[in-house]
Each structure stands twice: as structure tokens, then as C-alpha cells.
Amino acid sequence: YKTQVEKILTANGRATGVRLYNDEIHNANWIISAADGHGTIFDMLDGEYTNRKIRKMYDGSLPTHQMCQVSMGVNRDMSAEPHWLTVLLDEPILLAGEERHELGIKHYCFDTSLAPPGKSVIELIVRTNYAYWQRIYGRRTYDTEQSQVSDIIIEHLDKVHPGIEADIEFVDEATPMSYEHYTGNWMGATSGWLLTGKTMPMMIMGVPKQLPGLSNFYMAGHWVEPGGTVTLAAASGKNTIQLICSSDGKYFETSLP
């Protein structure tokens, strides 16, 4: 628990356990990876259990959820506003070298633990390109670009909610590099695959939760549930247990705590 897995152990085409980064080994009858899909397949399993379809999925050609996020604490009660608002911009804005035509604004007033009465936590989201941030990561340009993105987004937020810029008390920026660093998600993808014409068939047909040539192993999470979201990722865990019960000839039964 709370320890990173280095390798998934296998023997004779069967998953047998995991080795942690502290060299501890934990054996198991079944292994379920809810970790990053690319890291699971190509790092923890060394790419030994793939086929052409899987390699194509993870060759970088399919779009993924790559976002810039600006979070802020404001001295304003936003509870009467829509929880999530997508603003279509009259004029495109240039962020991280690309034009963007919309801005997502979300507040968290439904969770009173996040801010004291009369104040709010706001999150602003805009799509971006991982490769751009990767090129400048570790250089002074990276910090400068983060600040510029934040300034531009706040400027447009003030147009939607006049005067809110003066109410901002705290700002924090996150790029795909932030997501990659803190969550381990490949290319900093926040919700796995981005739903487009290319990836819609994956959502309709489903992404296999098992890997070719490897038994007693399943994947769960947004990399096997195109479209992402916490709800889909959580449901994939339940679906995985159903599949294991079926293979063991056991009845899957749920109960309320």
C-alpha cells in the first residue's frame, strides 16, 4: 500500500505477483493493474505481452486528454453559478503555441471542505499539447509559459465573471508534465484517450482488459475505458472483478455497506 510497483512478475505466461521499488515481492493469484496503461504494458511488463493493435494504440498517434489546468482560490461565493461551464470564445486565444477556442470553468462549492464560507475554489481547463511542454520542461521558459497561460486564462475568466480577478487569493498551474510527474499517466493524459472520430470505435467496441499471452492478469482504469472520467474508471474495476468471478465459476454479488 502506498508503494510503487516496479515490475509485474510472470512465469509461463501467467502473472504471479509484483516487485516493488524497495525490492519487496508480493505473490498473488490475480494481478489487476489500475496504473497507467503505457507504463503497465511497456515498463512493468517490458512490452512482452503485446500485439500489433496494442502497439498501435500506444504509438502516440491517437489523441489523449492533455490539459492545462489553472486552479485558484477566490474571495467570492460561486455556489449560485453553474458547476461546470464551457465558454466558447469570440476570438481564439494562443496558449502554448496553439489556438484554443473554448475554456472550461468549474467550481467546487458543492464541497464545503475546500474553502471557507463566502470563498470558492475554481478550476479552469484548456486543451494543450504534451510535446510542447515536454520540449521546454526544466528550462526557465517552462515557468514563464505557465505564468503566461495563467494570466491569459484569468483575463478571460474576468470577462465571464466581471471583477473576479481582484478576488483571486491563490493560483496554481498544472501542465501535462505536472500530471505525468504526479500521477504517472503517459503523456500527462488526465483521462486516457480523448474521444474523437479516431477513438470512438474503441469506446463502442471496448478495449480488452487482458493482454495476449498473459493469464491471471487484468487492467482497469481509464486506459481501458475510452472517455475516461472517475465513474468509468471505477466501474471498470467492478467489471474486472465480475470477469474474474466468471472465470472462477463464482457468482458475482454486490451488497450495500
Region spans (language model):
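Mid-domain catalytic core of redox enzymes
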Residues: 4-117
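Active-site-proximal substrate-binding core of FAD-dependent oxidoreductases
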Residues: 10, 245-257
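Catalytic phosphate/nucleotide-handling subdomain of diverse soluble enzymes
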Residues: 21, 38, 244, 248-250
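Hydrophobic, well-ordered secondary-structure elements that form the walls
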Residues: 32, 72, 124, 157, ...
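Glycine- and acidic
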Residues: 67-68, 133-141, 219-224, 257
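C-terminal segments that line or cap access tunnels to active or ligand-binding sites in enzymes
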Residues: 75-180
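A glycine-rich dinucleotide-binding beta-alpha-beta segment and adjacent secondary-structure elements
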Residues: 163-226
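A conserved FAD-binding loop/helix module that cradles the flavin
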Residues: 222-245
